Amino acid sequence: MKTDTAYYVFDLGRVRERIAYLRQLLGTEVSLAYAVKANTFIIEGMIPYVQRLEVCSPGEAAICERLGVPPEKMVISGVYKTPSFIERSVISAPGRIYTVESLTQFDLLRGSCPKSTPSTDSNPVRALQKADCTT
């Protein structure tokens, strides 16, 4: 096939083989995550094979939401977390997992937690809110 436009071909079968290989080496106690920024076009193909999708920007989160990725399957990571993005994420999906890159991000996350929700260890956001990082 001749074309004037560059294109990429991804073999999801090979990707699944690689995931199976990693699973064999690491066992089931290790969770695997797919970094959405690597290639947003294969997200749907990755969902059944990894435990989490690492999302590092509001744009990546929007893509995952449009594709119907369950919020509990996303890890909100990276340094680019605006206050409005964190607040919207916490309100729309209180069970999401977050990485915190700084005390500023921790304070933003803790400040976005609903005050009326009972604390439980099963809700990572609430567990973070219980931590005392002021001393």
Stretch-by-stretch model annotation:
Residues 112-115, 124-135:
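Active-site loop/helix belt of alpha/beta enzymes
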Residues 1-116:
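A charged N-terminal "starter" segment
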Residues 102, 122-124:
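Short, structured patches in soluble enzyme cores that scaffold and shape functional sites
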